Amino acid sequence: MSNNDQKRDEGYIEKLVQVNRVAKTVKGGRIFTFTALTVVGDGKGRVGFGRGKSREVPAAIQKAMEAARRNMIQVDLNGTTLQYAMKSAHGASKVYMQPASEGTGIIAGGAMRAVLEVAGVQNVLAKCYGSTNPVNVVHATFKGLKAMQSPESIAAKRGLRVEEIK
């Protein structure tokens, strides 16, 4: 784990993905504020992301962490990897993720790696195409993880057995 990880007493793993300084130009000059992008997960399939904005960096990070805890989703994992290969996009960012065999590790870059680590995925091959803007990459990764379903839930929706859909 890197130095921007934190373990809370609730059992969540928190990661800071990005801190950005933004400026608003007013009559008297510029007003600088900070935005933070964070991801939070329990390492067992629950993961959330949030954005916060404030005049000070710690306050922006705190707001982002709270937003991430409110925005949690449950991901159906297949042990320590994904159920199947998937593509997802948000804005100009496109992501591709596929399951990997045991011992592969997380082969993913930047913002995608942070999301997959806190979600509890330990073996995955992932690639980001197009824009690598961390905000859009995190959104695209979340869209893909949210859309992923286990074979059991797909079979239940179709009224079939798991063996019949494979």
UniProtKB/Swiss-Prot annotation:
InterPro entries (UniProt xref): Ribosomal_Su5_D2-typ_SF, Ribosomal_uS5, Ribosomal_uS5_bac-type, Ribosomal_uS5_C, Ribosomal_uS5_N, Ribosomal_uS5_N_CS, Ribsml_uS5_D2-typ_fold_subgr
Domain S5 DRBM: 12-75
Secreted is among the record's keywords: no
Keywords tagged on the record: Ribonucleoprotein, Ribosomal protein, RNA-binding, rRNA-binding
Domain of life: Bacteria
GO cellular component terms, semicolon-separated: small ribosomal subunit
GO biological process entries: translation
Gene3D superfamilies: 3.30.160.20, 3.30.230.10
GO MF assignments: rRNA binding; structural constituent of ribosome
Function: With S4 and S12 plays an important role in translational accuracy.
NCBIfam families in the record: rpsE_bact
Similarity field: Belongs to the universal ribosomal protein uS5 family.
Summary of subunit composition and partner proteins: Part of the 30S ribosomal subunit. Contacts proteins S4 and S8.
HAMAP family assigned: Ribosomal_uS5_B
Domain comment, as recorded: The N-terminal domain interacts with the head of the 30S subunit; the C-terminal domain interacts with the body and contacts protein S4. The interaction surface between S4 and S5 is involved in control of translational fidelity.
Protein name as annotated: Small ribosomal subunit protein uS5
